[in-house]
């Protein structure tokens, strides 16, 4: 489809595809705009009269549209080109934000909020994950682990770090609703870098018939290559806790004496460590093996640190630093799943867009699954029971990853290191 980029500049040696550098910058700014409400929206809604179940449902519906959009992003990017898919995501994001803030939040109209927040949910997967497909086609295989590590670096840095730190300042300076309005400015700036300054060309595949066929491949590939499906399941588990935590942990932390600002600072610092380790585990995966990195650092590591993060306010008497450190450990090990974005598309010789569609669906589903787990279980087993469920899922993902094996004729770094 496209000739892959090969270069020897310092940018290439870092594993960052030089032709797409502006796109990476655009992603971090766009995702900062998208992440302005993640750490505070749930407690804000509770303070304004909604129940935690209503809040969980709002995030669940939002997650459903994110999951749908995530699946379509892979095949639309391959069939129509990443630029068109990303532009579609930008427009849907802006439309949804205008409706959610201007009509839903302004009047606290729950029905309007459900519909418009769902529309907003179509936005960022089409924008960000279409760019990820772009990366997989334009990067040499021996550098792909690092290239996707950089993607998750900018994705997470924008969504969870800059978004959290910016909102901790903005909500006190310009207020909650104006903070959400400002997200439109940031996504437009991000789109300028990713779509205007980024001059790299991606040639879409085929005619209308082949594009329809490409959409169907996003479903049929799981039958043709079941390991792609397993990879998608592992990707779901990867960030389920990340999207479950904001629904109930701010309230849990408040019970142990943490203010909203302190929680946002903890959340932002957690993902500061995460973005650093996104890069580290990109390199580690290319050398130690993608599968081993996912199993031990991602699955087992996150299973343990999820429990540590939850119990640290109890064990350490509500101390800020022990909670922060335990959260940082969880955030760092969360990056152990980064090699999935290299492993899954490498399971197939062709139809990488379809394989990425499954992986992108796996990245989108946690936005639905995480809040759904909280909404369904917290009333019966409490927040402690929910945390054990989330921890157990991580250990399950380690077991599942054992079955994601590459053909013996392939040379990608699944279990052995690759010389560079």
Residues covered by each model-derived region:
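A late C-terminal transmembrane helix in Major Facilitator Superfamily
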Residues: 350-381
């Amino acid at each position: 489809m496209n000739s892959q980029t090969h270069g020897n500049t310092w940018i290439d040696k870092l594993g960052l595809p030089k032709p797409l550098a502006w796109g990476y910058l655009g992603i971090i700014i766009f995702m900062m705009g998208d992440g302005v409400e993640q750490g505070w929206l749930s407690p804000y809604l509770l303070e304004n009269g909604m129940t935690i179940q209503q809040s969980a449902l709002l995030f669940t519906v939002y997650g459903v549209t994110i999951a749908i959009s995530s699946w379509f992003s892979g095949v639309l990017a391959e069939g129509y080109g990443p630029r068109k898919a990303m532009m579609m995501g930008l427009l849907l994001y802006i439309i949804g934000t205008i409706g959610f803030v201007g009509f839903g939040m302004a009047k606290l109209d729950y029905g309007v909020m459900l519909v418009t927040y769902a529309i907003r949910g179509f936005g960022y997967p089409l924008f960000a994950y279409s760019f990820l497909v772009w990366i997989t086609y334009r990067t040499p295989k021996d550098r792909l682990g690092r290239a996707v590590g950089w993607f998750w670096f900018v994705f997470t840095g924008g969504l969870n770090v800059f978004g959290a730190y910016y909102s901790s300042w903005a909500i006190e300076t310009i207020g909650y609703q104006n903070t959400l309005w400002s997200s439109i400015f940031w996504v437009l700036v991000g789109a300028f870098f990713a779509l205007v300054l980024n001059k790299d060309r991606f040639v879409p595949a085929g005619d209308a018939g082949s594009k329809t066929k490409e959409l169907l491949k996003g479903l049929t590939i799981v039958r043709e290559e079941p390991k792609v499906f397993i990879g998608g399941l592992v990707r779901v588990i990867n960030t389920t806790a990340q999207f479950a935590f904001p629904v109930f942990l701010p309230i849990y932390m408040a019970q142990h004496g943490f203010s909203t600002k302190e929680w946002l600072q903890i959340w932002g610092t957690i993902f500061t460590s995460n973005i650093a380790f996104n890069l580290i585990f990109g390199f580690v995966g290319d050398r130690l093996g993608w599968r081993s990195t996912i199993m031990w650092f991602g699955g087992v590591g996150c299973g343990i640190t999820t429990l540590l993060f939850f119990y640290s306010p109890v064990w350490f008497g509500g101390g800020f630093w022990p909670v922060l450190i335990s959260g940082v450990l969880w955030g760092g090990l969360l990056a152990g799943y980064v090699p999935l974005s290299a492993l899954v598309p490498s399971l197939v010789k062709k139809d990488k867009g379809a394989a990425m569609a499954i992986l992108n669906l796996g990245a989108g589903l946690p936005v639905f699954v995480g809040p759904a787990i909280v909404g369904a279980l917290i009333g019966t087993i409490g927040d402690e029971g929910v945390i054990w469920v989330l921890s157990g899922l991580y250990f399950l993902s380690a077991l599942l990853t054992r079955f994601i094996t590459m053909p013996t004729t392939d040379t990608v770094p699944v279990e052995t290191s690759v010389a560079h």
